[in-house]
């Protein structure tokens, strides 16, 4: 067992190794099973050292994380600047940086900056150039269309064309789309040749709405899946009254289901978060879980949850209790 895990693994079993490198779909990019999301880096963090982006990225590197995700929208460029600065001491060939396009910051800096939707060919090129400047890097590895929910025609037309040109010319290694819905991602899978998808919140222990259509398409077409929102806005971190699901207060129905999942986990002496973060890896299309954190402590907890020894009986109970569809793969083949 690698020394870096001896302090965070229960027993001698390691169900999921956060540092394991996996090829991302049909692309030539490999990502660590645990990836670091830069969403929180666009907001104010704890003032002490543990809360700094540099400390979080350093600890992530020690754990074995090599895939780092950001976007212009996160803090209106602040996340990209912080991620670029924090990764500057690591060799470019050893790290994987992903960012997103589809929103230009106008003006590019200053107190009046606002995000402006733009999935045009020129808009994509400008967005990437500005992201590279903010991060002070020459290139990124993965480039996603960011939440094109109301912009299908432009994103799938000129936007996709721009991404394809960037991939073909070697400016980026992989192209994808990141969304909080699965229906449009399934359409991208059918009508384009994207390499990967960032699926946020739609393939989790609580919500498997991507299972029926999107996930089979990804398996069939070798599209790598990056899972975001594994705790569904916090409800799978603690399903208490007032918990959030999909960025808003959870309905009684979602809260009740999350509490049933928590009860199954409690019977098997397993944290709900451990089951939640390990669940997606049972699907063959899933390469990595992307998790945003605000402190080194949160990062270490995610690594512990990923490496926790989840009993096989827990997965069987989840199936028996009807908490996932019969067609849903579970760890260990249960």
Question: What is each PLM-predicted segment?
Answer:
Residues 3-13, 18, 52, 148-334:
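Beta/alpha (TIM)-barrel catalytic core signal, keyed to glycine-rich beta->alpha loops juxtaposed to Asp/Glu
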Residues 47-60, 119-135, 180-187:
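Short, acidic/polar
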Residues 94-106:
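A short, structured active-site edge motif that brings together acidic residues
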Residues 39-51, 110-123, 152:
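Active-site mouth loops of central-metabolism enzymes
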Residues 1-95:
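N-terminal binding-site loop/beta-alpha segment at the start of enzyme catalytic domains
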Residues 132-151:
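Active-site groove signature of glycoside hydrolases
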Residues 105-118, 241-245:
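Surface-exposed, active-site-proximal loop segments in enzymatic domains
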Residues 24, 36, 68, 83, ...:
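Conserved, mostly hydrophobic/aromatic
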């Amino acid at each position: 067992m690698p020394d870096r895990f001896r302090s965070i693994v229960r027993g001698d079993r390691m169900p999921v190794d956060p540092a394991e490198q996996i090829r991302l779909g049909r692309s030539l990019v490999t990502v660590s099973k645990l990836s670091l999301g830069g969403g929180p880096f666009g907001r104010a963090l704890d003032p002490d050292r543990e809360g700094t982006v540099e400390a979080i990225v350093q600890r992530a590197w020690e754990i074995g994380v090599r895939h780092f995700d950001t976007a212009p929208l996160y803090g209106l460029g602040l996340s990209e600047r912080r991620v670029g600065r924090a990764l500057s001491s690591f060799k470019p060939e050893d790290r994987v940086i992903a960012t997103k396009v589809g929103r230009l910051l106008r003006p590019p800096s200053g107190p009046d900056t606002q995000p402006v939707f733009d999935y045009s060919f020129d808009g994509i090129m400008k967005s990437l150039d500005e992201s590279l400047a903010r991060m002070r890097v020459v290139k990124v590895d993965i480039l996603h269309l960011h939440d094109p929910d109301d912009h299908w025609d432009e994103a799938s037309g000129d936007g996709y064309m721009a991404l394809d040109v960037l991939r073909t010319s070697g400016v980026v290694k992989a192209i994808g789309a990141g969304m909080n819905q699965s229906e449009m991602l399934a359409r991208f899978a059918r009508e384009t040749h994207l390499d990967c998808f960032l699926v946020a919140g739609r393939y989790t222990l609580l919500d498997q709405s991507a299972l029926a259509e999107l996930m089979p398409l990804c398996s069939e077409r070798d599209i790598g899946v990056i899972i975001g929102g594994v705790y569904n806005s916090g409800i799978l971190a603690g399903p208490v009254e007032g918990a959030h699901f999909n960025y808003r207060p959870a309905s009684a129905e979602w809260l009740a289901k999350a509490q049933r999942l928590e009860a199954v986990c409690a019977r098997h002496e397993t944290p709900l978060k451990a089951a939640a973060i390990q669940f997606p890896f049972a699907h063959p299309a899933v390469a990595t879980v992307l998790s945003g954190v605000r402190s080194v402590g949160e990062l270490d907890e995610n690594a512990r949850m990923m490496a926790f020894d989840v009993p096989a009986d827990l997965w069987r109970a989840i199936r028996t209790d009807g908490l996932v569809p019969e067609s849903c793969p579970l760890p260990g083949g249960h």
